[in-house]
Every structure is written in C-alpha cells, then in structure tokens.
C-alpha cells in the first residue's frame, strides 16, 4: 500500500527518487475505494487444494478481494466432487459479459501434450483473448503461462526429456520495478514442468520484460510492458507437501520421475519438506495485486478498455 504524504513535504521527492510508493494528498482525496473483483480459472485436477493455495496468497494484503471461481467446461472431474464444482464454480459463459480487476489462470498437468491436442485449447484461446479487453491484469501460472506465451507471442516452448521438479534458485532483474519490489537478489521457487523458455529467445522475439530466471531452468517471471499479462512459469502458491504428492503420483503412474531437487532435507524423501519459498510467493502476489491491479484499475470497471 502507498504511504500518503503532504504534496509539499520535503521527503516526498526523496522517497520518490528511491522508488518508494508514495501518494500525494491531492491524489488520495480523489481515490474511490471498492473491493477488487478477481476471477480464478482453475485448470488443476485437485481444485480444492489449488483454490485454497491461491486464495491464501490473495488474502495476504490489506485489500478486500471478491473472488469468483470458474472452470473451462462442465466435464466431470476425477479429483473434485461434483457437488463442490456445481456449488462454487461457474462456467465462462456466465462471467464473460462482466469486467474484472484481476484474473488468475492456473497450471495444468499437460506439459508433454501439444497445445493443439488439449481438448479445451480453443476455449482457452477464447478466454485469453477475452481477458485482454475485460481484465485489468491476468496472472498466468505454469502451463497457462506456457500456453499464453505461445498463443500471444508465437514463442515455442522447449520440451525437456526430464521434468523440472523441485525448488530452484532464481535471479531477480529490474529490481526497481513494482512487480519485484522487495524481492531478494536471489530467491527460491517451486517448479514442476517439462517446458522452459530461453531468456535470450524471449527477449529477442517479444516486448516482454524478464524479471526473474534461473540458469538451468529458464524464465520464471515475465510481464508485458503494461503488466496486463504477467507470466509465472512455476508454482509460488504450492504448499510444502505439493511436490511430494506429485512425485508419489508420478511414481504410481510408472513415469519413473526423478526426485525433486533441493526439496527433501538431506535428499531423503522420508523427511518432511520445508517451504523455503513462502515469503517470495506472498510478495509476488501482493505486488501483482497492488501494483498491477489495484493501482491502475478504474473505479468503474465499465471504463476498462
């Protein structure tokens, strides 16, 4: 949140020069405040787990956020009770005639499948295109980030033979940008994907700003110049046990996965993992919600272009 100070206070210019978020009294007096409207398109199999993880991060700000959950279609889910979906989820057609402050599109366990072979690919493209004109800022997570980068920029993902699974150390760039304000120079974040995007290729073929990457894992965080599209190729929302559960799932399916790196204490899968990425995840969501959504969204969403 910004600090409200007198227009004439000598400290004002100093704070602004240090990129501290200040707001003049004259601007503050003109602000109208209302709850933010945030939409979540949940593509993950375990929807209750995922919606809880994301809402936990969305709630960690002083802002009031009204959340609505949607699904891509009404197909039956193997991992989420029908009663839960019918009660708490809407179809896209029900919300598409409204405008929204923020939109989160989750990942999906589809990393080895070509995008055009995903049964809801056309619907996904429709939703992404809709979001460009009806949402102040959209946050794409993991598979959704890969899919959106391919659709919006024609960027081709590099599919690895082995899965990137574990906690990876990332480098922060453009430290003074609001999206990464407060980030450490390096931070840990969970990854669970087969795809990666090379930083140099993305820089040369798009207008995206790359805010974080890893030498052995490619881009982690990038955004369009106006931050209306923000891409996260990992899972800052994951609980401490999520990667463990995915690892066990892949073992049961006979996929012979490698043990997640930098995850189990002493590399012993019998020891309880510790979440060393939680503060970064909270800060990322807080910055996105504050600087990319709250500070730029119109009071009357009908004015959103």
UniProtKB/Swiss-Prot annotation:
<feature type="binding site">
    <location>
        <position position="249"/>
    </location>
    <ligand>
        <name>substrate</name>
    </ligand>
</feature>
<feature type="site" description="Important for substrate specificity">
    <location>
        <position position="192"/>
    </location>
</feature>
<dbReference type="Pfam" id="PF04204">
    <property type="entry name" value="HTS"/>
</dbReference>
<dbReference type="InterPro" id="IPR033752">
    <property type="entry name" value="MetA_family"/>
</dbReference>
<dbReference type="GO" id="GO:0005737">
    <property type="term" value="C:cytoplasm"/>
</dbReference>
<keyword id="KW-0028">Amino-acid biosynthesis</keyword>
<dbReference type="GO" id="GO:0004414">
    <property type="term" value="F:homoserine O-acetyltransferase activity"/>
</dbReference>
<dbReference type="GO" id="GO:0019281">
    <property type="term" value="P:L-methionine biosynthetic process from homoserine via O-succinyl-L-homoserine and cystathionine"/>
</dbReference>
<keyword id="KW-0963">Cytoplasm</keyword>
<feature type="binding site">
    <location>
        <position position="192"/>
    </location>
    <ligand>
        <name>substrate</name>
    </ligand>
</feature>
<dbReference type="InterPro" id="IPR005697">
    <property type="entry name" value="HST_MetA"/>
</dbReference>
<comment type="function">
    <text>Transfers a succinyl group from succinyl-CoA to L-homoserine, forming succinyl-L-homoserine.</text>
</comment>
<feature type="binding site">
    <location>
        <position position="163"/>
    </location>
    <ligand>
        <name>substrate</name>
    </ligand>
</feature>
<dbReference type="GO" id="GO:0008899">
    <property type="term" value="F:homoserine O-succinyltransferase activity"/>
</dbReference>
<protein>
    <recommendedName>
        <fullName>Homoserine O-succinyltransferase</fullName>
        <ecNumber>2.3.1.46</ecNumber>
    </recommendedName>
</protein>
<comment type="pathway">
    <text>Amino-acid biosynthesis; L-methionine biosynthesis via de novo pathway; O-succinyl-L-homoserine from L-homoserine: step 1/1.</text>
</comment>
<keyword id="KW-0012">Acyltransferase</keyword>
<feature type="active site">
    <location>
        <position position="237"/>
    </location>
</feature>
<feature type="active site" description="Proton acceptor">
    <location>
        <position position="235"/>
    </location>
</feature>
<keyword id="KW-0486">Methionine biosynthesis</keyword>
<keyword id="KW-0808">Transferase</keyword>
<feature type="site" description="Important for acyl-CoA specificity">
    <location>
        <position position="111"/>
    </location>
</feature>
<comment type="similarity">
    <text>Belongs to the MetA family.</text>
</comment>
<feature type="active site" description="Acyl-thioester intermediate">
    <location>
        <position position="142"/>
    </location>
</feature>
<dbReference type="InterPro" id="IPR029062">
    <property type="entry name" value="Class_I_gatase-like"/>
</dbReference>
